[in-house]
Structure formats: C-alpha cells, structure tokens
Amino acid sequence: MKVTLPDFRRAGVLVVGDVMLDRYWYGPTSRISPEAPVPIVKVDAIEERPGGAANVAMNIAALGCHSRLVGLTGIDDAARALGARLSEVDVTCDFVAVATHPTVTKLRVLSRNQQLIRLDFEQGFDDVDAAPMIERIQLALPKTGALVLSDYAKGALARVREMITLARAAGVPVLVDPKGTDFDRYRGATLLTPNLSEFEAVAGPCKDEETLVSRGMKLIADYQLSALLITRSEQGMTLLQPGKDPLHLPTQAQEVYDVTGAGDTVIGVLAAALAAGNSLEDSCFLANAAAGVVVGKLGTSTVSPIELENAIRGRAETGFGVMTESELKQAVAVARQRGEKVVMTNGIFDILHAGHVSYLANAQRLGDRLIVAVNSDESTKRLKGESRPVNPLAQRMTVLAALEAVDWVVPFSEDTPQRLIADVLPDVLVKGGDYQPHQIAGSKEVWDNGGDVLVLNFEDGCSTTNIINAIKRRAGQRTVV
C-alpha cells in the first residue's frame, strides 16, 4: 500500500471534547517512608502536557494542520497552563470556562520511568449548560475539513447527537473516539475508532476475525455509521466499511514504551489526513504508522511530519534523504531527543568520486547522524566559475542521499554554510582538506555551543577538477584550474 503525505497545511480540523491537563512529577526514590510502607520520591522535575481532546488537537497541529479546540475548563491554574501550552504549538483554543468546576487534571508520579501513582482532580461537567459549546461548533464548522469528537466521559459531549447532526448537515465528516457502551449516542457519525476492548464491550467477545468483522458490520448498520476503525494494540487495526472488504493494517510499532495517548494520535492523524484530501483507507494507513511511532515515546506525545514520512517509508524515524532547512531542524531535534550525536559537513560534491565516499564514511563514524550541506548551483558558479556545476543541485543531492553514510542532505545558497551551521549547531563540524579548524565556516558557533570542529584528510589524487580535466583532455578541450 503506497501512501504519501498530503499537504496538511491547507487543512483545518475542529476538535470537540473532554480536555484535561496531564501533570508528571519525576524523581528518584531510594528509601521507604517512616510514616507508611510507601516509597519516598524526591521530585526534581515537573512536566505539564495537554491530555484528552487537547492531546488530539496537539497531534493535529504537530502535522502543520490548523487545529481548533472546543472544550470545558475551570477557571484555575490548570486551565491557564493548558491554554498556554496549546498556544505554544499553534492550537486555537475556544474554551468554555466554568467557575464551579475544576479543570480535569491527572497527576502522575514517576521514578525511573515507572509510574508509582496517579491522582485525578475532576468533578465532571455533565450538569453544565452545553449551549455555549454548540454555538462555538456552529461558528467553526464552515471553516472545518473534519470534526473530531473526543469522548472521555467527563461531560463535554453531553449533546453529542446534536453535534453530529450539525456537522453532517454542513457536509463535514465526523470522527468519534468513543467512551462507554452506549454507542447509540454516536448514531450517524462518519467513523468510530473504538479499541478492541471497547468494541467487544458493545458487540460481544470475538473469538476470530470472521466474528469481529460480522459484528462490526452489524454495529455499522445498527448505528448508521459510514465506517468503523477498530484499534487492536499489537494486532494493528481493522477498517470496516459497508460494501468493501475489511482492511487490516498490522502494527508498525518497533518498541513500546508507553501507550498513553496513542488513541489520540490515531484519530488526530486520521482526521488531519482526511481534511487534507486523503481517502479514508490512506488516512488509516497514516494513522497506523503514527501510532507505531508515538508508542515509542514516554507519556502523551505527538508525531511530526518528518517522523511520519520516515515511518511510512520504513526507515529510521529521524533519517532519510533530501530535506529543507525547517525539516532538517525537526529531524535534528528528534535525533537529540534520542541522545544521538549529529555530525555536519558541507561541499559542492559536483562529480561524486571515491575520495568523497571515503571522506563521508569517515565523517559518519564521528557520530550517529551525518548532515551534508550542499552549495546551490548559483553558489557553485560564484566559487568555481560559470562552467560549474556539471551536475545540477537536485542531482547532486539525490546521489549524496543514496550513500549509506549520509542521513540528511540540505541545500544552501550562500557562499558558505555559516548561517545554516549556526542554526543547526551540530555536535561535530567536519571539513576536508588543508584547513585549520578556526578557518572553517561555522566553527566559532559550534565551539561556543560546546561542539567539536575537525579536519579530515581527502584521499590523494581524487578531485572533481582532476576528473573534469581528464575528460577534457581526452576530448581535446582546454582544461580548467
């Protein structure tokens, strides 16, 4: 199944549901409390992340898609923290603040990556007037490519049937992450995304694939759905649609550290892809790939376009090929989160030869990821004359990207890559030839950041100029210097 990423930037998704704040307290534990037989955690780090429907909205925004979030909060520090964090990642918040209720907050205490306890602060919003929620939805629907209803049974979706009716009347697909066993309240939705246990709680235990499919199709008919996506943990996910064969997508997870928020990622990526114009099948494929990435992270997390692109290409999450500067910065950030050492070099690489290959292999051995910055055609002409480059930029970058030693290839248009190096700040900056380290463009910035600057030897007798001159001699033309 070949799927490409759509242009998420042209899409908009409205998320409505139960927003919450996930708080994490981290610290070591080395002794038992004298007051009770419980461990003492010395808290040395605190983290706050949007959860529930807010995590769905973050996953959508992380792809570059316009994300608007409607939900209920209290008037408290948790609501302010939630709004501030969401604003940082370009989620448009349209909250209804309720003075009589606290913002739903879940506090987790962790030590050595193990969760010791979770404390929930919540009252439920079932008794709150939902009219302001409906008004906000009506105003947002005309600019929305898809509506996500994220149900955590906290009361924000008390009038969910009305929300579905409004969206369908506006021609907007409705995707629901359900909660509980009353699926009738989601009647008429475009798609439901229950996990296997949620599905079986409604449809009954499924001993085999045939039973799962038949009961899923019955559920679609009973509740007038357009489709059903059952997420099945290590068994992947299954898409059911009337009149079509079931589509089973095997899991793509390589390592599973934490499944917290994985369902939010699935429905968020699925909605963003649909809103951007992908088919439902292709959107499910992308959502499945995103789930495989996010479960490899700790806590509620998002997936970037770079990670998703790499996941669907079946390569390592942070490494492949030709990139723009903004994509490179994202990829480097992901690599650093994994503790990887980033090496960077630059050059024209006009006619790739054995000396280049040997040099790049040696550079790659200095770290975990190798960036090659390549002079643009205009930059090359200024440095080498009007007869260069022999090969245009796109071809030079394609050849470099095919080398096993190279992770990322990025162009630059200036005479030197100093600005780009200062922006990326690699752990190791490498240049080949007879330079002194202080002469290398970007060396000061790398040193100031605590990095290393190294000079590697080129292989004797190998140069692009020598190759060009040899070709010209054989053709009887004037050689170049």
Curated annotation (Swiss-Prot):
UniProt feature coiled coil, ranges: none
Domain of life, per the record? Bacteria
- Chain segments carrying region Cytidylyltransferase: 344-481
Supply one GO CC term from the record. Answer: cytosol
Q: Which UniProt keywords apply?
A: ATP-binding, Carbohydrate metabolism, Kinase, Multifunctional enzyme, Nucleotide-binding, Nucleotidyltransferase, Transferase
Entry's Gene Ontology molecular function annotations? ATP binding; heptose 7-phosphate kinase activity; heptose-1-phosphate adenylyltransferase activity; phosphotransferase activity, alcohol group as acceptor
* Extent of the signal sequence: none
Give residues annotated as binding ATP: N195, L196, S197, E198
Q: Which GO terms describe its biological process?
A: ADP-L-glycero-beta-D-manno-heptose biosynthetic process
Region of interest: Ribokinase: 1-318
* Reactions catalysed, as given in the entry: D-glycero-beta-D-manno-heptose 7-phosphate + ATP = D-glycero-beta-D-manno-heptose 1,7-bisphosphate + ADP + H(+); D-glycero-beta-D-manno-heptose 1-phosphate + ATP + H(+) = ADP-D-glycero-beta-D-manno-heptose + diphosphate
Q: Which Pfam families match?
A: CTP_transf_like (PF01467), PfkB (PF00294)
Q: How does it assemble?
A: Homodimer.
Family, as annotated:
In the N-terminal section; belongs to the carbohydrate kinase PfkB family.
Q: Which HAMAP family match?
A: HldE (MF_01603)
Q: What is this protein called?
A: Bifunctional protein HldE
